[in-house]
Amino acid sequence: MRLDGHNLRRHFLARAIIGAVGLICALFSATAMRAEDCGSGVTLTLSAPETTQGTLLLSEIRSATELDEVTAKWNDRDVPFWRNSQKPTGPIADIRKGLLGVDLEKPAGVYDFTVATRLKGGEHVICRLSVNVREGHFETESLTVKKQFVEPNPEQEARAQAEAVRLKAIYDTLTPERLWNGPFRIPLDGEFKGSNFGKRRVLNGHPGSPHGGVDFPAPTGTPVHAAQKGRVVLAEELYFSGNTVIVDHGLGIYTFYCHFSEIDAHVGDTVGPGTVLGKVGATGRVTGPHLHWGLEVQHTRVNALEVVKLRGIGNDLQ
């Protein structure tokens, strides 16, 4: 059949629409959420069908009946859930969310995530999802630092070990309420780019531990802001990380900020997104001025940039 000008335009418009729909479907398929129907009107979803070392997953429980209790297990740890701040509509009566951290050294494999719910009225519903964790691709870098940070003397080593015990105690503390509200932000204003998370480091020729934070090279004195609302639980000089601030955001979520030239925060301060915590510097084990920004999620080391990505429809932290 021959096509006149009008029909030809309609033909190409239809082809374009079909192509656009195909592209949209492909995009949604590439970022599909993982979903499980648990029965009794309860569903469990994860923000990705599989993941890699050092990443963060958002979990969501939706229920047609109000929930009296939600408990969850991941990596042999409890995962606290919070009630969604936006009131559910339609057939959904309750929405709860939780964050799952995949440690940067967690072996690749398939792991179970289990959520137990108790509906109003007493019925118990169990949800289970298997999560495929793939190996991350982390580069190796060689750095030269002051000898004392690779081969510390007995006094320096004792100090570093004592600080490690204190840090573990901080990260083991789970504040039962959510202190943050909304998306997290990058701690620096401007076009600073963060990198180096997970890199395997060789320090002065000696193998070191994987890099557990994101580095932002920036001039000394650049203001560093809190990524979200929380409470300052540490603000002092530490042996390896120099002038350091740690913020507790509740529910086992901590951000930490290292190598400051100056600390402007104090333990006990309540800070909001954008509050100045200190200024970029080169204290501790460094090769130059930069911000080391880290994220701990229920005592797992996660790429801090992951929490910034969790915004938008379906992935909000409201």
Question: Model features per residue range: what roles?
Answer:
Residues I186-Q318:
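Catalytic cores of peptidoglycan-degrading enzymes
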Residues R9, L27-A30:
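N-terminal twin-arginine translocation
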Residues T31-A35:
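Sec/Tat signal peptide C-region and signal peptidase I cleavage site
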Residues T45, C127-S241:
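Surface-exposed, glycine-biased beta-strand/turn segments
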Residues P88-G121, R128-R134, F138, V233-V267, ...:
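Contiguous, well-folded functional domains in the mature portion of proteins
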Residues R15-F28:
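Bacterial N-terminal signal peptides
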Residues M1-A14:
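N-terminal secretory signal peptides that target proteins for export/translocation
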